[in-house]
Design a protein with these regions (language model features):
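Short aromatic-glycine-enriched beta-strand elements
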Residues: 224-230
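Phosphoinositide-dependent membrane-docking surfaces
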Residues: 194-195, 202-222
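Low-complexity, highly charged intrinsically disordered N-terminal segments
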Residues: 53-97, 108-110
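Short, non-transmembrane cytosolic segments of multipass membrane proteins
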Residues: 9-72
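Long, charge-dense tracts
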Residues: 2-5, 9, 112, 353
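Extended, Lys/Arg-enriched charged tracts that mediate electrostatic binding to polyanionic substrates
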Residues: 184-194, 198-201
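Canonical phosphoinositide-binding patch of PH/PH-like domains
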Residues: 45, 232-295
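Alpha-helical transmembrane spans
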Residues: 82-180, 300-358
């Protein structure tokens, strides 16, 4: 039995929105254009629609190989949400091989064909017109051929070729990958109310969840304005926005729903948010288990869901529309009234051991 199979008791430091203790005011005031500070402790009870669609696919696929969700690669449970902070990680490693191969196949192949045509022309003393004609036919011809053959050859390289080449080094590579991922692994911990953000080389920025301010950050990219959840430590203004948890979204309401979901996850007076990734662990969280018992929630709702029908029906008409139409501006912050009620010197004595110095 693993630690994720055991029901838990929450620590005294766990986040409770109804019991936010006095906090010192921040010595620094943050005023940045393109950032919207979000209130803490008032909930809409929504889940991010687009993330939910992806998570349904992920959980249904993962269950086929790990029905107990005990694999270390499943990073969400009733105790903590794990994510990568500022790490390129496995996605880069998976991307760089096919990208390099396709680049070599197309650009390298065209250059080789062009060099070959020139070499043949010089060797046989062909006329410039003939050499140019051959180049005009063969170089674009190779480009078309390269694009046609790129997909099957890339699939073979990623599935068979790279596995054959790396097989003798499999254990070493897996060990190094695990170490790299672990070094960049951060977490929101529901049990003790702490946020631990990896800084690399075994270092972590750790602080209580209540010390983080949430902002909706505007991200200007080609094609328009997008949005992302950004966490800023209230006292030292350390910013965390390029994480595996906060992705860039086209709809602002998706980011607002993500912040709402995260708060309810951390708030131990609330049941776990009803999201796909947390479903296998709901019965292990005491508050959630009692909530589900009273409401009669189907314990396999997400895992047995017909996703396409859901997207055409309840998913769009209820989940998406609710987050889009919710009056987000009506929320009040339960944290703000507690600021300035205690000195920094007094507060430092109350912080958990291991928290980043302020």
């Amino acid at each position: 039995m693993t630690d994720t199979d055991v029901k838990i008791d929450f620590e005294s430091t766990a986040f409770r929105a109804v019991m936010i203790e006095p906090l010192p005011s921040s010595p620094k005031k943050r005023t940045w254009i393109g950032e919207e500070l979000q209130p803490m402790g008032t909930y809409a009870g929504v889940i991010p629609y687009y993330a939910t669609v992806q998570d349904v696919e992920a959980i249904q696929d993962h269950e086929k190989s790990d029905s107990g969700f005990s694999d270390k690669d499943w990073w969400w449970n009733h105790q903590r949400i794990r994510f990568l902070n500022g790490k390129i990680g496995l996605k880069f490693l998976i991307f760089v091989v096919p990208f390099t191969w396709i680049l070599t196949l197309v650009i390298g192949g065209m250059a080789t064909v062009g060099w070959g045509v020139l070499s043949v022309g010089r060797h046989y003393d062909l006329s410039g017109i003939l050499v140019g004609g051959l180049g005009f036919i063969l170089v674009p011809g190779w480009m078309l051929f390269a694009f046609w053959i790129a997909r099957p050859t890339t699939n073979w390289i990623m599935s068979t070729g790279i596995g054959f080449i790396l097989k003798p080094f499999e254990k070493t590579i897996n060990k190094r990958l695990d170490a790299t991922l672990e070094d960049g692994c951060s977490e929101f911990n529901r049990v003790d109310g702490q946020v631990r953000i990896a800084l690399g080389r075994g270092r972590y920025f750790e602080a209580p969840f209540v010390e983080f301010d949430a902002y909706v950050e505007r991200v200007v990219q080609h094609g328009g304005i997008f949005y992302r959840l950004m966490l800023v430590h209230h006292y030292i203004q350390k910013t965390f926005n390029k994480t595996g948890f906060s992705t860039i979204e086209s709809e602002k309401s998706e980011v607002l729903a993500l912040w709402d979901m995260l708060q309810r996850y951390m708030d131990v007076t609330q049941p776990l948010p009803d999201t796909p990734r947390l479903e296998p662990f709901r019965h292990l969280d005491p508050v959630t288990a009692e909530h589900d018992r009273k409401t009669g929630r189907n314990p396999r709702y997400w895992r047995d869901l017909d996703l396409e029908s859901w997207k055409d029906g309840e998913g769009w008409t209820e989940v998406h529309q609710r987050q889009s139409r919710f009056p987000w501006g009506s929320r009040t912050c339960k944290l703000t009234p507690q600021l300035g009620k205690i000195s920094m010197e007094e507060y430092r004595k109350l912080r958990p051991p291991g928290a980043w110095p302020i």
